[in-house]
Amino acid sequence: MNGKRPAEPGSDRAGKKVKKEVMAKFSDAVTEETLKKQVAEAWSRRTPFRHEAIVMDMDPFLHCVIPNFIQSQNFLEGLQKELLNLDFHEKYNDLYKFQQSDDLKKRREPHICALRKILFEHFRSWISDISKIDLESTIDMSCAKYEFSDALLCHDDELEGRRIAFILYLVPPWDASLGGTLDLFSVDEHFQPKQIVKSLIPSWNTLVFFEVSPVSFHQVSEVLSEEKSRLSISGWFHGPSLTRPPTYFEPLIARSPHIPQDHEILYDWINPTYLDMEYQAQIQEEFEESSEILLKEFLQPEKFAEVCEALERGRVEWSSRGPPNKRFYEKAEESQLPDILRDCMALFRSEAMFLLLSNFTGLKLHFLAPSEDEPEDKKERDAVSAAENTEEGTSHSSSEPENSWAATSDSSLQSEGPTDPEEDEAKKESSVPTCQGELRHWKTGHYTLIHDNSKTEFALDLLLYCGCEGWEPEYGGFTSYIAKGEDEELLTVNPENNSLALVYRDRETLKFVKHINHRSLEQKKSFPNRTGFWDFSFVYYE
C-alpha cells in the first residue's frame, strides 16, 4: 500500500510533488486474533507453542521465531539496499568484532522509516499485548554486518530498561556451516552461563525476539564464510526493569608464597644473559620507564625444546575454564603434568624466581630485594587497597580470580562487621609476596572477557609462550591491556615463542585475551599436528 507524505507546513516543498511514503506490514498471521490469544496464553503459562507463523520456546529462556516477518519482498529488497548504503563503523573490543551502522532512530530513508514504524508502533503494541509488559516508545535499533571472523561473544543483554531484544535477518541463503548462528546458553545453579543448548540459523526475513533477563545468555558465533555477509537489524524494546538476583562471586583462587628453592634452578633453566647483574639493572631501568618488557629467548634452548615437546605429545590433561561470559580456554591439571612441565611451573613459583623478578622490575617480591622507596609506594598501594576493600559490599567487586584481593582463604577477610584497623595494618605489614599461576592451552574459539565485576589491583603479570611460531595478530590470542571504562588499548602482548612478557598493572588497568578466530587455522599449514599455542601465566603480588 502506498500513500503520499504530506509536505510540512512552511516547507518550500509545499505544493510540489514529493516522494511517495513507503508502507509495509508485518505478517497477518501473527496479528490474527485467535493466534494472538494462543501466543499470549503460551507466554503467560511459559509453555512452548508451535505454528507455521510463529514458534515460541522456553528452553533455555523465552524466545520466539517469526518467519516471513515482512509481507513484501520488494520492500525487503529496498530496505536491504538502503542499509548497505549506510556508513558502517567497526566495533571492536574484548566482547565483539563486527560492523555497525549509526543509530537508525532518525534516519530518513523511506524503507528504514517504514520499518521503524512497523517495529516501534505496531509490533511493539503486539508484543505488549501478548507479554503484558508495558513497553515504552523508546526507539533503539541499528544495523549490524558480520563478515568473515566476526563474532559477538557470550553476554546477557541486560542493561537498565531493556526488556525485549529483537533481530531481523536480511541474509543470503544460509546454513550452520557458515557460522553466524544465534547461540543460546543454559545456566547453572548460580545463574551463570553453562553451555550452548540451542543455535538459531539466520534466515532471510526471519525475526527473532527474546525476553531480556538475568539468564538470557547468548552469542553470535563466528562467521566462517569469506563470501557472504550476515546483515541484520537489531535493537530492544524498553520497559520496567526486572529485579536481578544477587551478584554471584566465584571462589577465589588461592595465592601462595614462593617455594624455597636454591638459586641453582635459575642456571638450569634460564638464558645466562638474564642472570648477569649489569644486564638485570638495564632491564629494570627499562621496565621502570614503561612498566612492561619482553625478554626474548628467556629459557635455555634445550629446556624450552623439552617443554614444547611435552606439550605437543598431548599427554597433558586439560580442563575447560568458564563460565563463557568471562572466559573460555583450557587449563592443565597440574597433578597429571609430565615432569618437565611440573618443573617449569615450580621454576615460576620458586624463591629464586621471585628474587630475579624483583631485580628485573624493582618490585618488592623478595625480602632481599632493594626497597629504597618502599614506604611511600607501599603505603599508597595499601591505602588504595584498603579503601577498595571497604567498598566491596556496594560496588561491582570482582569474582575474577586473577583480580581479587584475598591472598589465602583467610576467614577474617570475609567476616561480618568492622575489623580492627590496627589488626588489619599488622596483617598488611606482615604479608609476604605471593603468586598464582596456571598452564593454559589456547586454540580457535578461546578468549577471556572483561566483565562487570572485574576488580583490579597492583600486580605483575608474567607470560611465557610456547608453540606460537608463525602466529599472526589477526588470529587473536594476544593479551590486551586497557584503562577502565575505555576501549583504547594501552598495550598489546602478542604471543612469541620463548619470550617472557612482564607487565605491571595498576588499579585502573584491565586485561583480556582476544578471541581466537578461524584465521588461526592457517597455523596448521605449517604445523599440521599443532592446535593453537600454550602459555605459562603467572601473577605476582608484593
From Swiss-Prot:
One of its GO terms (biological process) is regulation of translational termination. Fe cation binds at H155, D157, H218. It is found in: Cytoplasm; Nucleus. Binds 1 Fe(2+) ion per subunit. Residues 371-435 are annotated as: Disordered. Gene3D superfamilies: q2cbj1_9rhob like domain. Its cofactor is Fe(2+); L-ascorbate. SMART domains: P4Hc. 2-oxoglutarate binds at Y169, R230. It is an enzyme of class 1 (oxidoreductase). The keyword Cytoplasm applies. Monomer. Prolyl 3-hydroxylase that catalyzes 3-hydroxylation of 'Pro-62' of small ribosomal subunit uS12 (RPS23), thereby regulating protein translation termination efficiency. Involved in stress granule formation. Belongs to the TPA1 family. PANTHER family: HISTONE ACETYLTRANSFERASE COMPLEX (PTHR12117), PROLYL 3-HYDROXYLASE OGFOD1 (PTHR12117:SF0). This is Prolyl 3-hydroxylase OGFOD1. The gene is OGFOD1.
